[in-house]
């Protein structure tokens, strides 16, 4: 489960940004329910962001039981999805959450997948320059937060991202299929399901802005172009004033 802040938003909500209807679900969480949760960058209550110019083999994190405290801090979209799958299939479910608010898709792509795009400058990966903006630097989030996970067996991917790529929707139309193809290749298990969320109906640029609408069109086309993929629209569950919709359940 990856993406930017709309994937990261926990069941307990952000500061002054609650999630609707989660209090009862959090309170009723119990370890006997076979849902387990792992969030990269989070361990022992500490939050340390990890990124790298080169792929790393390990990342900080720990598997957590299904308890009220743990559930309150896990990604809401991820948890609702895991809860649904567990109830319907009656099997143990594990979710791995790797997110960073405000991140561009380029940061989540491997060097191999992004190299064909000549307009993207990869020179910082080969020099001594400091990475000052990891969320917009190609490959560094893949290297630090996805590469260490590729030895895990997974059954599919959830993706909630795109707001930070509104400035170049045409490029995004090519980047996203390359990103998905590379993820599937890295895990080597065929066309694993890839489900993603269309960006929220936030008033990004005012009434005359069109970049968000164009990005949504691109996401719709990507769903058609990427095999074994699906897209959830959020146009009817969001709000133009809040970039993080309070209704997380409807997304799933």
For each feature predicted by the language model, list its residue ranges.
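Cell-envelope and extracellular/periplasmic
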Residues: 1-250
């Amino acid at each position: 489960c990856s993406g930017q802040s709309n994937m990261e938003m926990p069941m307990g909500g952000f500061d002054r940004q609650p999630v609707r209807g989660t209090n009862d679900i959090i309170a009723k969480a119990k370890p006997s329910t076979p849902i387990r949760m792992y969030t990269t960058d989070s361990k022992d209550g500490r939050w340390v962001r990890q990124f790298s110019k080169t792929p790393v083999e390990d990342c900080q994190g720990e598997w957590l039981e299904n308890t009220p405290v743990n559930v309150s801090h896990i990604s809401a979209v991820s948890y609702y999805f895991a809860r649904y799958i567990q109830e319907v299939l009656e099997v143990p479910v594990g979710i791995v959450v790797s997110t960073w608010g405000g991140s561009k898709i380029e940061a989540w792509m491997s060097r191999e997948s992004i190299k064909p795009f000549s307009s993207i400058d990869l020179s910082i990966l080969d020099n001594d320059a400091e990475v000052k903006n990891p969320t917009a630097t190609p490959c560094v989030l893949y290297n630090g937060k996805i590469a260490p996970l590729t030895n895990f067996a997974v059954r599919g991917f959830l993706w909630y991202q795109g707001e930070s790529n509104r400035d170049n929707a045409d490029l995004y139309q090519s980047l996203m299929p390359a990103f998905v193809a590379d993820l599937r290749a890295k895990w080597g298990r065929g066309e694993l399901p890839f489900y993603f969320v269309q960006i929220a109906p936030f008033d990004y640029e005012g009434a005359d802005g069109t970049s968000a609408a164009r990005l949504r069109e691109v996401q719709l086309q990507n769903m058609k172009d990427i095999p074994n993929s699906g897209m959830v629209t959020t146009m009817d569950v969001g709000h133009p004033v809040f970039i993080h919709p309070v209704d997380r359940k409807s997304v799933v």
